[in-house]
């Protein structure tokens, strides 16, 4: 049998899977396709890491490791749903929940006191941040808005805030002392094994990464961010923001850049509340407060103090706000600010939302205000300022007419910054950070750093670059759309890539294709001018811009990035099919618990499944899989045209109801097609059954709404309870079961 691996993840997509997967399995088995699940939720990953603490019955396999190996199989076919990129707070909450359910895993050591705790901290670190995607993404990224989705957005445009030319909103970034400012890069002339070390001022050497194997033609970079320059930057920007009377907002990606960005975030918090930290710093250290984890962790820790001392600290924190700018809010009604948690404001989602809102963010009074968007690292901050400039001059974009911006992203084999976590360090001393060839002793790259500076090494292998260029040319040819490589010749790393792109383009037939290389700001301006005229432009970018642009443009075009088609053609021949580019929607889960209404839109799952079946049809020469894929494609379009996507409002159609309509339309398409008589005969009775019982099924699905529910767990819900909640229509369940 052909096989599809369907991942079980977290939060809203995990709940949606309980409703949708039985439908997928029932339909797929008619084409000889076996659909298996693989649990890569944060709970499963934590448990897999500590088998020696568990009983035999409690142990779970390391599914992420197994899937990583599977990506090397030419027959791999994996559908990957969004998962939690856990912050420290989320990880600790998951650990606490698992311990409460009888799993005797160790506590998370905030400040490890011995070698054993260091090892526990290291092992838990594997589940922090974006730890899933780098393992599975053994290919480059092809993300685009399917035609049916784009057409729907044009006919049913989402709301867009109005931009004013006099808007004070702007982006602020460092102009010196950041990673861009001092980056060094080189392409290796041969395979080498290197180490990362810090040569201290007293002549001793501290080895930080003893052994890194590098390949011939690999691009390596060394860069650092100055702590001194960063703190001066924050002071300057906070004062400028206060004088301007606009909101201060900090935009980082602490989930992915899980070593560097929490540090960058923590420095902003300490500068903002500088007087309180100077007064209470010793006590905060004693309590083990680490504001790299946000103000939420500080408030949590001071609850242990006597009331008088706690109130004094709270007064001192509030007093700091008098001479600091107002903070942008994550949730005005609950008083949650931009500094609450580093994972609350994630740049690739927060910046597009602000731009879509006419350049405004929420203040503490629940009103919208202009803001200063602070992104310390200048490398990619400039693209957002370019878009803001464009919006101020031309006004907001029109979803009914704007063009689309598909992306071909370089990400395979942990390319660039997104693969640098294990090679990122906060310097413990002044000295020279360097990369040294172990065999020859040759110093390949070196930089002078000071205590507290963040320095890192990035790698980009040559095969992924060749594959990226090939994919860009293929997409240009298939879609007859210009491709722009967003590469800055003044950035050393990207200058190395430009040389390679120019070389590898010669390996392909580019006759009749429009392919250019532009710096990020020029590429953004060129793309926006085309978008405003309704023209399409493919962006070929590195790993970070892949992430940023595949949220930015879809949010403006479609209202969400969850409706993107996200395909990763694996370099060994298999396929990884990601369901959209959004997160795992904790607020959707909150609504389900409070009102038994799940507004998660599974369109991303429908699109990924279509591509997965298409891939299967080609790879396994499975004609029935092709019929299923074509029928699903038409059914998805019908679902959009008939407006059967989930409503945000309790009592109306939700995720479960949209799954019913998808199954109904899919069965009808299969019953109506003439390519395969066997499938036609199999699905005719189901189509009839769903048609006849439509009103009764929808009533059963909707009548359970409006009541609170308890799933007996968040990170590890009670499976029977959750399944019962997500499949509340006996009529629909029986109809799907009748297929097998």
From Swiss-Prot:
Biological source species: Psychrobacter sp. (strain 13A)
Entry cofactors: Mg(2+); Mn(2+)
Self-association and partners: Monomer.
This enzyme's EC code(s): 1.1.1.42
Activity regulation summary: IDH activity is not significantly affected by monovalent cations. The combined addition of Mn(2+) and another divalent cation results in the decrease of the activity.
Function, in words: Catalyzes the oxidative decarboxylation of isocitrate to 2-oxoglutarate and carbon dioxide with the concomitant reduction of NADP(+). Cannot use NAD(+).
Chain's gene name: 13AIDH-M
Induction, as annotated: Expression is weakly induced at 30 degrees Celsius, the optimum growth temperature of the strain 13A.
Annotated catalysed reactions: D-threo-isocitrate + NADP(+) = 2-oxoglutarate + CO2 + NADPH
Binding site for D-threo-isocitrate: 130, 133, 137, 143, 253, 418, 546
pH effects: Optimum pH is 7.0.
GO biological process: glyoxylate cycle; tricarboxylic acid cycle
Molecular function in Gene Ontology: isocitrate dehydrogenase (NADP+) activity; metal ion binding
Binding site for Mg(2+): 348, 547, 551
PANTHER family on file: ISOCITRATE DEHYDROGENASE (NADP(+)), ISOCITRATE DEHYDROGENASE [NADP]
Family from the record: Belongs to the monomeric-type IDH family.
Sorted UniProt keywords: Glyoxylate bypass, Magnesium, Manganese, Metal-binding, NADP, Oxidoreductase, Tricarboxylic acid cycle
Superkingdom of the organism of origin: Bacteria
UniProt keyword Chloroplast, yes or no: no
Major enzyme class: oxidoreductase
Cofactor remark: Binds 1 Mg(2+) or Mn(2+) ion per subunit. Mn(2+) is the most effective divalent cation in vitro, but the enzyme can also use Mg(2+), Co(2+) and Zn(2+), with lower efficiency.
Thermal effects: Optimum temperature is 45 degrees Celsius. Retains about 60% of its maximum activity after incubation for 10 min at 40 degrees Celsius, but completely loses its activity by incubation at 50 degrees Celsius.
Binding-site residues, NADP(+): 83, 85, 133, 584, 588, 599, 601, 648
The protein's name: Isocitrate dehydrogenase [NADP] 2
Disulphides: none
InterPro entries for the chain: Isocitrate_DH_NADP_mono
